Amino acid sequence: MSERFPLYTTNYIGGVMSLRKPQIASLKILEEIVTSVNLRKGMNLRAALGSVHAMYPTCSDFEREFMSITFVLATGVGKTRLMGAFIAYLYTQHNIKNFFVVAPNTTIYNKLKRDLSDNNNPKYVFRGLGCFPVLPQIIADDDYRDKAISLYDSEIHIFIYNIDKFNKEGANMRKVNELLGDSFYQYLSNLPDLVLIMDESHHYRAEKGAQALNDLHPLLGLELTATPLVTAGTKQVPFKNVVYEYPLSKAIEDGYTRTPFAVTRSDIDFYNFGDEQLDKMMLLDGIACHERTKGELEVYATNHSTPEKPVRTVKPFMLVVCKDTDHAAWVENFIKSDEFRNGAYRNKTITVHSRQKGAETEANTRLLLDVENPSNPVEIVIHVNMLKEGWDVNNLYTIVPLRTAASKILREQMVGRGLRLPYGERTGDRDVDAVMLTAHDKFQDILAEAQKGDSIFKAGNVIKAEDLDEPEEITYTQL
């Protein structure tokens, strides 16, 4: 127990921060590991691994040149809040004051910076904690060039960097800085208590990124991801340093996300369907789901609003996932044609992919970032691959994967983009608490996975698309 912060046990931190069960479990595992291992710079990694492996056999290798452990948490459970809990615990109980948070892309970097630094932000992770008389000092971007870090008032320094910028700026970061009296890299690597926190850590397994992090010589690495897999050629290799796993199926079962539903048809045999014919049917069935959901969300908000406590109306959108840019162009042309709902979505559809340039990219990206806004006209987003990690949208209700949902992992990743709860918790209304995945051509695969018991659809339902035109006849069939 810390003499300075005796109150700050894992239970106390969990209560003040309103942590969920998997977050508290992760925090307690960190406590057990850190108190069991002689945590210090230059420690015997083999002995440390032996201790951790004895407690958590799934951890058989740190996989880095420093002690690093992975916590696998499903999308939407709250990885950023858990980071805040890790920082609060390590500071109050182990006097650790330097944290380096790594983001995989600009979107997540901006989100982390906002959630860790802006105490006016509703998602500020340290809200309620009284252990920081002066807010933790955030060092990001080019702060290392023009600020004297040692002069900051706060005891705690949180460095936040996008891995791409960190890799590209490597040469500059290794140059001597007059304010530091050393290079930024050397300054960091000389810190006796630097803890590395890696968000979406499956992105930092490539040789260049991994070595850049190894060169920081941190005391400890804490990895957070929902996808503990590394692609090696044609194979996906599981992480070897996992100490805790909370899968998507468990998050759904525990009510921390919306419930996925598979949409299919029982009145048509798809065996002789061509690709375009099947695409058109899935798009039309998808938009029927979208329109029905839009109506149900409006009804829910109206029925549950009072003058004292109005309930906002959630504006849903539909995501169409295409196999490549040519396919996306064909889909966009079809959706904007009179053949698709008489052209009703002509001005409510955007396409986002890497080949777009200039003004088109900026305009569509702006609309995508703002897709939760009720005044945003977009109701259909056409995307190659899928919405990237970091798009924390809570109004994606219908997902139409065209020629792309070939594997269980891909289906889970797609559905994962639409699991966040728009009201922060389940409402008890089946339609408000659902996300739809059209699965006409993969329904038998989904059914087989469900029967094995390891699918995100195992406790879910099937919606028969042929019933969508008659809402009162919609059947929710247990898988």
Language-model region placement:
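Conserved pre-motif I regulatory segment
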Residues: S2-V72
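Conserved SAM-binding loop
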Residues: L19, V101, V320
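Helicase-associated low-complexity regulatory tails and linkers flanking the ATPase motor
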Residues: K28, Q93-I96, N110, N120-Q137, ...
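Pre-Walker A (Motif I) flank of P-loop NTPase domains
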Residues: C59-S60, R64-T70, K97, K315-M318, ...
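Conserved SF1/SF2 helicase motif Ia
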Residues: T70-V77, G84-N110
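ATP-binding Walker
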Residues: V77-G78, M386, A405
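Walker B catalytic acidic pair
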Residues: D199-E200, M386
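SF2 helicase motor core recognition
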Residues: V381-L396, G416-G418
